[in-house]
Each structure stands twice: as structure tokens, then as C-alpha cells.
A protein has these predicted regions:
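A short, acidic/glycine-rich surface segment
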Residues: 42, 62-67, 99, 131-132
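Short acidic/glycine-enriched loop/turn segments that link adjacent beta-strands
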Residues: 39-44, 74, 105-109
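Conserved beta-strand in the GNAT
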Residues: 56-58, 122
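Acetyl-CoA-dependent GNAT
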Residues: 59-62, 126
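Vicinal oxygen chelate
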Residues: 1-3, 7-16, 48, 66-145, ...
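Core segments of cupin and vicinal oxygen chelate
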Residues: 12-54
């Protein structure tokens, strides 16, 4: 019997003052919208992709306690399957978001960036390459060109 049915959501912790920046970031970068969230005993938002609340954000760090280099747990990054690499790259540049990118032979184009509270995000454009972005097999860091 199969019990695992797929990905449901990821959860990001932050402080209360980080909520607006996180909502704007994921709205601008991924087009996610704030939606229904149960009345928990802490502040937060749920960000929706259509009808699915795929990112839960909980304001559970006291004000000023978050350090971007702080490691909480064993998760290094969150990876997304993506499409439309050229347009996504243009969007990040327009928004002024720093990112690293690479073209990988037989694996596609990848973009790495951080959200406002330091969560590392990876976007995989599996069947795409962006030749003018970076040479095959190399990484371009802190790109805002």
C-alpha cells in the first residue's frame, strides 16, 4: 500500500516584521497569493498556487532573533521544477533579486536565490538552457546583470 501521495507544503519560520517582505517576495517571484489560514495561536500567512496553499509562513521567531546564517535543521534548500527560464531570469533582474545560475549538460538550467529570511531556493528548468546566461558547466554568482 502506498501512503505517500505527493508534496503538500513547505513551512518557513520568521519574525512578525518579516511577513510583509515574504508575502511580497513570493508574490513577485512565483505569483503566489495570500489565502485562507486557520486561526493558529501565532501570526502567519499561507501562500497559494491556485487553490493549493504550498507555502506556510509562521511568525515564530521573536523580533530581531533571526540570523541569515543560522542553520535550523538539516534542510539545505528547497527545489522547484520550473519552466520559462528566460522570462524567469528577466523577472528576477527586474525585481533586483540576486541569484546564481548554471547550465548543466543533459540536466538543464538552474537558478539559486534566497528569500527575505534566508531560505535557499533552487529552480530547475529541466529541458532548458540559457546560453547567454552562463557557459555550460559553470556557475555565475550574485547575478543582477
Amino acid at each position: 500500500m502506498k501512503f505517500f501521495e505527493g508534496f503538500l507544503h513547505l513551512n518557513i519560520r520568521c519574525s512578525q516584521q518579516d511577513l510583509p517582505a515574504i508575502e511580497k517576495f513570493y508574490g513577485d517571484v512565483l505569483g503566489l497569493k495570500t489565502g485562507y489560514r486557520p486561526n493558529f495561536n501565532f501570526s502567519g500567512i499561507w501562500l497559494y498556487d491556485g487553490e493549493d496553499p504550498i507555502i506556510h509562513v509562521g511568525a515564530r521567531f521573536p523580533k530581531g532573533s533571526f540570523v541569515k546564517d543560522k542553520h535550523s535543521g538539516s534542510v539545505d534548500h528547497i527545489a522547484f521544477k520550473a519552466s520559462g527560464a528566460v522570462d524567469f531570469r528577466k523577472r528576477l533582474k527586474k525585481l533586483g533579486i540576486e541569484f546564481e545560475e548554471q547550465n548543466i549538460e543533459n540536466a538543464g538550467y538552474q537558478v539559486f536565490l534566497y528569500d527575505p529570511v534566508g531560505t535557499k531556493l533552487e529552480f530547475n528548468f529541466l529541458k532548458e538552457h540559457v546560453p547567454d546566461a552562463v557557459a555550460l558547466g559553470t556557475v555565475a554568482g550574485a547575478n543582477m546583470r
